[in-house]
């Protein structure tokens, strides 16, 4: 079994780390596959595992995922001296932000002790102002309330310091000090000139945020103080110093070689809808598209919207709940994208688009999908088998449910779709052949007179159109050997059989001008 490289990024719902060998082993064993398109790359575990073996093209419609894949596939060249200067800038920015909301920060620290009254902390969190609820009558929040008044969602604030997380997510997804740390880090990253280094630093920050967030395992909604136990859990997370944790993770990334790329090995990364990506990359018989599409109606833009906001850092307009006409509880972006694979009415059609685009180009296709998803496994199999020869592997998994202790059994199916040779654009190819005037006087076969000799130019055209380069042609009744001869001339391997011993001798004579090592002739 192959050993695959792993790297720590996010606590991610769609990670394929547990089935990585089931995905990568058949790809690596197939020497005809040179390029793998990781179409729904997520946190890039598949692409990162394969990059030592194949050319990898990464794509994901979510911007945070695009940044992560750029980082782990292409790395950066970031010296220890440059890193030390970076942390100095971060500390300066953090000190500035601490001064802006010093009263709220001092109050927050008083809760970072044992045996507090959880109701006091509950009130403190509920009184925290934000762009969603800009007013607070808590005097400890006076500075933060003033800061919030300068920020209008959807507009860049006229301030000379960063405060997006402080004004959007304080005491929601993160503590107040943590939001100051995130804003300081993000502002310092923006000042880094090299895009590769920016991507790596953003990935480090996202990884730490994922572990420190006041959530279960994602960012669909933040946890609230409702009891002593939830209060203790939240305070444990909010005591985490995000700057210091980023420094520690950078050490791991540096050990992995991710920060010391002397020459960039370029892996292309895209931030496109799956269909747009398939139209943008070169697909052919040496390409495999790995597709791990969304399984459910709950969309990744909902679960990881905070990370998109971090990467874009654009003070976004926020989504309104159409039923309550108020801001969504999860504080989602207005511009969240929704995949057709997550819509029951459109998911099967999306699969048909995926399969058809890949099959038409003659590319290999691998799909991973679970048995409790929107599209029934049998329907997906039927759809794939219309255009591919399909091998299916079932992998049994156990899933926890969003941080709960309950475990559910799930079957993950891996569809390995091998191109059906010679099926595409058949009508066009037959029309071309019809236009040919058959020529029987084969220069290679003139030395004998065989009654049913095939037109050599028609045979040649058939081989060129339907047999791939370095492919093999088999003629079960080769007769005078026209098919074998033309295949040899065109650089294909050839296998021929004929019950007639005279045909064997005639064909072997005809082939004396060519390399017989390319040809196997059996009676």
Task: Outline where the language-model segments fall.
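Conserved acidic residues
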Residues: 34, 286-288, 363, 471
């Amino acid at each position: 079994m192959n050993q695959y490289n792993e790297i720590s990024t996010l606590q991610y719902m769609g990670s394929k780390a547990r089935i990585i060998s089931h995905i990568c082993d058949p790809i690596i064993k197939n020497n005809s596959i040179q390029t793998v398109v990781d179409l729904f790359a997520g946190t890039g575990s598949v692409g990162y595992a394969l990059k030592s073996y194949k050319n990898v093209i990464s794509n994901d419609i979510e911007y945070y995922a695009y940044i992560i894949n750029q980082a782990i596939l292409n790395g950066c060249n970031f010296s220890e001296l440059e890193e030390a200067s970076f942390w100095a800038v971060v500390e300066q920015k953090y000190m500035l932000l601490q001064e802006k909301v010093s009263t709220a920060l001092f109050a927050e620290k008083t809760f970072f002790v044992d045996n507090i009254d959880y109701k006091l902390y509950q009130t403190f969190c509920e009184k925290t102002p934000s762009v969603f609820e800009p007013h607070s009558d808590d005097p400890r929040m006076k500075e933060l309330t003033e800061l919030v008044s300068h920020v209008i969602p959807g507009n860049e604030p006229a301030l000379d310091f960063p405060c997006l997380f402080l004004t959007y997510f304080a005491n929601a997804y993160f503590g107040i000090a943590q939001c100051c740390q995130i804003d300081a880090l993000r502002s310092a990253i923006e000042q880094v000139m090299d895009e590769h280094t920016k991507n790596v630093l953003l990935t480090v920050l996202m990884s730490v945020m994922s572990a420190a967030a006041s959530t279960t395992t994602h960012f669909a909604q933040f946890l609230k103080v409702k009891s002593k136990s939830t209060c203790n859990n939240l305070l444990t997370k909010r005591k985490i110093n995000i700057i210091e944790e980023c420094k520690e993770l950078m050490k791991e990334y540096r050990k992995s070689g991710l920060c010391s790329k002397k020459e960039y090995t370029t892996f292309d990364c895209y931030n496109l809808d799956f269909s747009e990506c398939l139209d943008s990359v070169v697909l052919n018989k040496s390409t495999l598209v790995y597709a791990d599409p969304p399984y459910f109606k709950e969309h990744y833009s909902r679960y990881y919207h905070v990370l998109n906001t971090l990467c874009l850092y654009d003070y976004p307009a926020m989504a309104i709940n159409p039923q309550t006409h108020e801001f969504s509880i999860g504080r989602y972006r207005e511009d969240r994208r929704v995949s057709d694979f997550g819509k029951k009415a459109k998911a099967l059609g999306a699969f048909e688009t995926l399969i058809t685009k890949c099959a038409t180009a003659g590319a290999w296709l691998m799909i991973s999908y679970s048995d409790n998803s929107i599209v029934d496994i049998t329907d997906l199999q039927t759809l794939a088998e219309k255009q591919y020869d399909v091998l299916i592997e079932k992998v049994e998994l156990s899933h926890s449910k969003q941080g709960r202790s309950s475990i559910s059994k799930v079957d993950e199916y891996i569809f390995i779709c091998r191109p059906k040779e010679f099926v595409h654009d058949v009508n066009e190819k037959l029309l071309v052949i019809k236009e040919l005037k058959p020529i029987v006087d084969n220069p290679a076969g003139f030395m004998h007179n065989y009654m049913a000799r095939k037109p050599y130019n028609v045979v040649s055209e058939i081989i060129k159109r339907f047999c791939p380069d370095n492919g093999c042609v088999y003629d079960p009744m080769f007769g005078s050997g026209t098919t074998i001869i033309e295949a040899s001339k065109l650089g294909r391997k050839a296998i021929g059989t004929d019950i007639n011993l005279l045909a064997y001798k005639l064909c072997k004579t005809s082939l004396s001008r060519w390399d017989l090592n390319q040809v196997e002739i059996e009676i």
